Amino acid sequence: ECCNPACGRHYSCGK
């Protein structure tokens, strides 16, 4: 999980 917009397409906060 990544809650940082820098993760780009890997962004998945709470999913």
UniProtKB/Swiss-Prot annotation:
Select a single GO molecular function from the record's annotations and give it: acetylcholine receptor inhibitor activity
Q: Does the keyword Secreted apply?
A: yes
Which residues are recorded as modified (Lysine amide)? Answer: K15
PROSITE patterns listed in its UniProt record: ALPHA_CONOTOXIN
Q: Disulfide bonds, which pairs?
A: C2-C7, C3-C13
This protein's UniProt keywords: Acetylcholine receptor inhibiting toxin, Amidation, Disulfide bond, Ion channel impairing toxin, Neurotoxin, Postsynaptic neurotoxin, Secreted, Toxin
Which GO CC terms are listed, alphabetically? extracellular region; host cell postsynaptic membrane
Tissue specificity annotation: Expressed by the venom duct.
Q: Cite the InterPro entries for this sequence.
A: Conotoxin_a-typ_CS
Keyword Lyase on this protein? no
Q: What does this protein do?
A: Alpha-conotoxins act on postsynaptic membranes, they bind to the nicotinic acetylcholine receptors (nAChR) and thus inhibit them.
**What family is reported?**
Belongs to the conotoxin A superfamily.
Q: What domain comment accompanies this record?
A: The cysteine framework is I (CC-C-C). Alpha3/5 pattern.
- Would you tell me the protein name for this molecule? Alpha-conotoxin GIA
Q: Which organism is it from?
A: Conus geographus (Geography cone)
